[in-house]
């Protein structure tokens, strides 16, 4: 593997300059309320023929270029995912997994589950020590790694729906890895923030901390080993990852470091086509991901509860109180009842029904908070997103993850990528809080060999009341994915915000237990926060991270693409 540090030379500048918006145009900058953290709202990119919104501007441009060359939404989203594995190693991945929601122009919708699975050697209490404490092994190091699903998933969606040759959609990522790209400030910050953890693992430190320090903004990053891995995938499809040289290197790393993933685990991995969940909110149709993602069920339950109330003014105490109470109830069900449908029987029809939502509304007081501990379950539990709309009106929302930034921190020597730490998304011990801040209850998401761990990923497509494509969105950000997607949808439909304003708007988050509300800086006016505290809500301020949404909306002006200011990027279209 080779890497090169340099300050921008002519070659570096030409490489960076090659990735500029095609014929998409930006509207004028607008101002949101001055109290918002992101008060200067960057304009959406507007294009007539196709749009890509991803968490890195290079990834967005790769997808837009595929559309311009005649590729469809699936071609573009596969190309974006592979490019993202190069330019966003902290989150973009081939060592993780994810979910796709895809709607064809004619109206048929599909969902693909390529979530990681527990290795065959995994055991129920593998992260609980002799004192009953959950160890760090669930999120850091080789024992946190699940069997990767990304390459199998990307291959399968392209096999079924892609138009361009497979090699053509992988080729941009190969070029980026081989020729290099300029590291920007946000990605340099991510590396610097993970420096101490990366130092613990020699293969990761050797490449990502050359000379003992991380790459900095302005350096050019070349990844020869990753380019070679992508060449194998381009030549052989999923077989080029799950068998042969790449698989051998993954297994060798597992043996060297003490991980559990074996040759048989890799050979036996399969993605699964599932039926998307569908619901309605104030006349709009919501198409979203079913379990093993918890995102779709939790989103639909929350929207169904909200549908019984008239919207209050955005940011008011009444508005924020209701949101907190709805999130509390939807997450309580999520954390106790949901899991892998191959292992767990779930009451999905009930949880997503309007009758159940009405029952939940009867437990909500509009004048005070309901402590989560007082709610009984009603019996009968680093990510990235890409949104694409092509010229034919096909729409795709894809969310992938390796969980934390740089996943397990285990870097596959000679292959050039990080492996996930998704085993932390299982319930290591009922009642324990995982590193995403979720206290999971019961056994629905317990560790079992071959089982898919519960996810919060929420790729979603929204149709307007006349059945026309309206909105395509998703998010990264752990448990906050669900509430970010929920709030953007409600901001658009209930508060009639333009898409950019809906994404930029301040957010709050409650995942039932622990019983406290996360808030962005300046998310609540002081008098609103005081009123909510008097009602019994408890807040903590999260200054760093609050999920990042990528979204596309169909408007009279064309396709609007918006990315989230919380991790700077840009959409691209033509």
Model-predicted segments: where are they?
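Bacterial N-terminal signal peptides
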Residues: 9-21
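Sec/Tat signal peptide C-region and signal peptidase I cleavage site
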Residues: 22-26
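Noncatalytic scaffold domains of N-terminal-nucleophile
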Residues: 27-61, 73-237, 241-243, 248-290, ...
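Alpha-helical support elements that line or immediately flank enzyme active sites
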Residues: 66-67, 152-160, 236-243, 248, ...
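Active-site rim segments in enzyme catalytic domains, especially the processed small/beta chain
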Residues: 86-111, 260-262, 395-465, 499
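Short, small/polar residue-rich loop motifs at catalytic or cofactor-binding pockets
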Residues: 273, 380-383, 405, 455-457
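Internal maturation/activation junctions in enzymes
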Residues: 309-402, 411-415, 422, 430-432, ...
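Extended C-terminal subregions enriched in glycine
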Residues: 451, 485-486, 494-544
